[in-house]
């Protein structure tokens, strides 16, 4: 009996580990959780390999367990792809811990089944390895989880055990990194948005979990109001009742909402501008969104400031000068108050260094570079601002002048696989050495891979216990890849695939010892399993920066295209993922783009592949579209037709599709194709109902259409674009607001020009 479910699970685990290697999540709770998932999967994977090699028997119960874990691993991969620092930290950690629990439960179930099955196996070492896996999986426990802290905090809140409750809440605040009042406000808004999404999904379990998390955020806000004191002058703290229940800052302009609660105007306006229609404190639905000034509270605050001889000027606190207290709000700038609560002080001091280089409030590192005319397609080079996300390995590039250079939109795109991201998997260890109780170690040595390349020359040498292969064994594997026996070649490709999943050294070592060329020849194999092992091994090797150029130089493009056209679903997916990984390098983008067959094969997969295949194809095409000349090639391959179809929210590909369309809209052929394929209505719908990233890129496409064609501008207006653009100009991301405002301004200019023409 062919263990298909086991093979599927192994493939899913390999893809997940590869994705982890390509990500740079800097948010410690999620990074720890992902690391522990990797450890559990690495414990189980060798046993599954033995099942495939028929060293351990299998049965239907095992297949059922593998299918369950396969589903969980795919959920974990989806989470990793979709998570962003813009989303709720609380939800992210909670979801990640739920997935970790499922991985442990499913792994333990499979291990126990394997233990029973291995009793009948003649290989005693199999029994020992399975027993060790069961023992380590059973004993695994992640300390100080959010779920554990949350359960204690909420339970103690109900029991009114305030001292213990405070301790748990402070631990949660520290875990989530809610350093400032603005961090808390942002988290409150994102959690409420998650509640709206869970209501739309109509899942009772999701709604129950969401309500618990909202209750937790309420507890945190109340806790901070009671325990975190803000000093406006030495020894003078702001009373809690003068502070906004939403942001916990001093209410500079107190207003009353429909529920009767008072908030600071700036904070509650941010809440309402994000489309949230419930009271942040009472959870009542707001019957209207009018903000009524609370002159009583405002006068009380002014009186309190005057009594304490305090004047709050921008970025400073000094003696009150006897001026008009009613003008208080106009004189108050950003609240530069001293936080006197000890645990908050430790939080701020520990984070100031890492945050000091960031732009205030956006979570991006900013770097200005010069982009040449070859990228922009113009006679002059222009300065672009590169914003690099501090977590899921995404890059976000855009030009201030859309007419000068095409937009490089934000998708799940890794500009390069750094040594730090590769080392997130850690060095390869034998299962007997791994302890799932340890957090995943991450190397910060940026020269790690280059030093590895110098160390592993093609001469016989001994190795330490890290799991790196010997050169003699590598050479033997390379010779096996050239063998006349299909069975020997398949086994060698499978072993290289396995050895390159986790080890940086093995990737470098195998690449330098000549495995790439024979692996490429196996991509033409008529044996689908051989082809799949070979293309996945190449995908793993391509993670290494040192291998990327080498793989393309020895002629990888044509064989990878062959797999895209002839392989099974998994081989096609991994071939597209390989092209995505290789296209991180500019020189590779140009070479791949010059092969029209490669672009056409990726477009075919985008249109007719599996869901995973479509996502990998979209990612690869996005990378290729960064190079200007490739934009027209992608359009000519009929990609726009499929991308417009993928704007359907039910297909769960909107963000990737609209990001690629944003790049393609920079060329005339792309704009014509978008309109011809009926993209305008779906783009307007994305501006209205899409994610923040989707709205941003959809607005960028519409802007390109309108700036370059009055006819297209009329079509956009006919689709009712103005209301969602007005909303986006007030509540979107900074870049989305800019795009929306540019569009609205363009519409006004067009209208004024028509009116002038009519009068004349």
From Swiss-Prot:
ARM repeat windows: 504-543, 545-584, 586-626, 628-666, 668-707
Swiss-Prot/TrEMBL keywords: Coiled coil, Repeat, Transferase, Ubl conjugation pathway
The keyword Transferase is assigned to this record: yes
Disordered: region residues: 424-448
Domain U-box: 237-311
Molecular function GO terms recorded: ubiquitin-protein transferase activity
Annotated function: Functions as an E3 ubiquitin ligase.
This protein's pathway: Protein modification; protein ubiquitination
EC numbers, comma separated: 2.3.2.27
A Pfam family matched in the record: Arm
Listed name of the protein: U-box domain-containing protein 3
Residue intervals passing through the bilayer: none
Lineage: Eukaryota, Viridiplantae, Streptophyta, Embryophyta, Tracheophyta
Coiled-coil stretches noted in the UniProt entry, renumbered to this chain: 146-217
Bias (Polar residues): 424-434
InterPro entries reported in the protein's UniProt record: ARM-like, ARM-type_fold, Armadillo, RING-Ubox_PUB, Ubox_domain, Znf_RING/FYVE/PHD
Any one GO BP annotation for this protein: protein ubiquitination
